Design a protein with these regions (language model features):
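Core catalytic region of metal-dependent phosphoesterases/phosphodiesterases
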Residues: 6, 11-105
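Extreme N-terminal starter segment of soluble prokaryotic enzymes
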Residues: 1-4
Length: 149
């Protein structure tokens, strides 16, 4: 199986993605100019990003959010199950989002977690911050671990 990994695209969809079975996008997907604008982010994800995903030379795209993906943090806090199903349907089931979740593709176990340790002088400024001392993450044994930190 051929797996490709990228991160920190910040809205730049003019990337040459090689042919692969699975593309893993490890955070900071949204354009920096729109990162805190929820309506603009929603529109971008549902139109530009989904169309880009459908055009990629791969069978599956797995996304974990990054510290600039505020829209995904909001969806996670408010309606994660609905959002994942909605995006999967929009992309003809090509797109999979992971937040502390496993996903199996052709017997390969992927696990994704987006959390970052708070930056001491900027606490609560970024999406998906988590104090690992107070709230540690239990990562299962997996074949491919996707993180942003």
């Amino acid at each position: 199986m051929k797996i490709c990994g990228i991160s920190d695209i910040h809205g730049d969809l003019n990337i040459n993605i090689p042919e692969c079975d699975v593309l893993c996008i490890c955070g900071d997907v949204i354009n920096l100019n729109d990162q805190r604008d929820i309506p603009a982010s929603k529109h971008w994800w549902e139109t530009r990003f989904v169309k880009w995903v459908e055009s990629l030379p791969c069978s599956k795209v797995i996304v974990i959010p990054g510290n600039h993906d505020f829209y995904l943090e909001r969806m996670y806090n408010e309606c994660w199950g609905w959002f994942k199903d909605h995006m999967s349907l929009l992309s003809n089931k090509k797109l999979e989002f992971l937040i502390d979740e496993s996903f199996y593709y052709e017997d390969i176990h992927f696990y994704g977690t987006p959390w970052i340790e708070p930056i001491s002088f900027q606490k609560n400024k970024w999406a998906f911050e988590r104090d690992f001392n107070e709230n540690p993450i239990e990562i299962p044994k997996c074949d491919v671990l996707l993180t942003h930190d």
